[in-house]
């Protein structure tokens, strides 16, 4: 199947873009039973989302897409910096962000990251802003 271009095209069209494993699905199902965890997570995400958006919104080298979930999409406006460069620098500091160049409609000028713990978010924002 994998060597047949026709089958691969059908799989590409019909498959879920970000599928999850059975183990991940089971963990998520259990997690959603814990209301305390859900409320605490929502509160932390709300706080961190607003702090990060405020901290980055004054930089003219990025376009922020206002987040309404637990992640933010950012377009890099500085010509000599790519998403790969930012992702590599973040990775060196133990922070994983998504280079969005392989997402249809985006390019190597887009990154996406989830909101984390405050200390990790501070390191993330400082790393990105130092490059820009």
Residue ranges and their predicted role:
Residues 1-58, 62-65:
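PLP-dependent aminotransferase class I/II
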Residues 3, 16, 77-78, 116:
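Structured loop/turn residues at secondary-structure junctions
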Residues 11, 86, 124-127:
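Hydrophobic side chains in well-ordered alpha-helices
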Residues 15, 49, 98, 112-114:
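Short, cationic motifs built from Arg/Lys/His that form the positively charged side of catalytic pockets
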Residues 27, 72-73, 106-107:
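Short secondary-structure capping/turn micro-motifs that flank functional sites
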Residues 44, 55, 89, 127-130:
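Alpha-helical scaffold elements within enzyme catalytic domains, especially in hydrolases
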Residues 45-46, 50, 59-93, 115:
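Conserved PLP-binding catalytic core of the aspartate aminotransferase-like
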Residues 92-93, 102-132:
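PLP-dependent enzyme catalytic core of the Aspartate aminotransferase-like
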